[in-house]
Amino acid sequence: MLIHWYPGHMHKAQREIREIIHKIDVFIEVLDARLPDSSTNPLLEEIREGKPCLKVLSKADLADPDITQAWQRALEKIEGVKTLAITTQQPGIAKQIPDIVKSMVPHRGMPGKPVRSMIMGIPNVGKSTLINTLLGRKIAKVGNEPAVTKRQQKILID
């Protein structure tokens, strides 16, 4: 007997991402700074098709700063991505994300040509908190249980 473990919502999300991949300029993957390797989506590399990626290590205040920096260096060197460690106590750090993303695709950062990013990550890594921080208001529902946000949303961030 062969048992498959691949929840339907994950399959649906992957299919939806593949349908809009051609519209995405930069991927923003949110990881938990306490366990970056365990909180990454192993399918992201395949899904993003070589497009630029910013890996945001959230909850950095709960992780060892030296280990977080080591993870950032490793991710940047091995995966060729940019990284940023953020905390909810210092929202100014997260507010750098739009400028970082624009620098990753300079041809899209011109007036009238917005950068189209996709924020993604496994449940409970801080995606909704990051969106709320970037917008400066609560637009994405936040909870301490997985799958509070169950669908893709289009949100304009300056």
Please state what every model-predicted region is:
Residues 18-22, 45-49, 109-111, 149, ...:
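Conserved catalytic network of the ASCE P-loop NTPase/AAA+ motor domain
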Residues 32, 75, 130:
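Residue-level signature of catalytic and energy-coupling elements of molecular machines
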Residues 54, 60-121, 139:
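Canonical P-loop GTPase G-domain recognition
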Residues 20, 34, 47, 78, ...:
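Conserved, well-folded catalytic cores of nucleic-acid-processing
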Residues 1-49, 139:
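N-terminal accessory targeting/assembly segments
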Residues 9-14, 36, 135-158:
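Switch I (effector-binding) loop of TRAFAC-class P-loop GTPase G-domains
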Residues 117-142:
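Glycine-rich phosphate-binding P-loop
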Residues 5-8, 12-15, 19-22, 39, ...:
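Charged, alpha-helix-enriched surfaces in structured cytosolic catalytic cores
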